[in-house]
């Protein structure tokens, strides 16, 4: 079984029956959309695709870095960790540290995050949350998008699909009265 298939199966097991709090879909459906988007960008690297399946697993389950390292190797585990919040820190510092991690993360991590943001914002549009709550969630996702944007812009010619995802995000957010992300 491939590492990607193992990661997908692991996610199915760990997220069994869980629904995302910001949308009325399962974690598995969201992660399927993230991985599909990544493949649409032309990503074929096994470690990157496995990490995309596992990107939220440290944040939302009792899965540890060591367990990921043991099951999927250090490359996947480090990539997942770069997209995870450090729950041992106080809440106020957690967010600051997370933003720093995103800024310093690899292009692969930033591409996964872009696909995560794209899927999350699309799902928010159809979410049962109030308009005010949707806008609040969108603003948070847009903040993360702006953090990773410089590296995405640098690589938009090599990975042309990046601009399409940003345009898709802009389509949704402007319908909520938010300013579009400038991507040039």
How would you describe each model-predicted region?
Residues 1-184:
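Active-site helical microenvironments for divalent-metal-assisted chemistry
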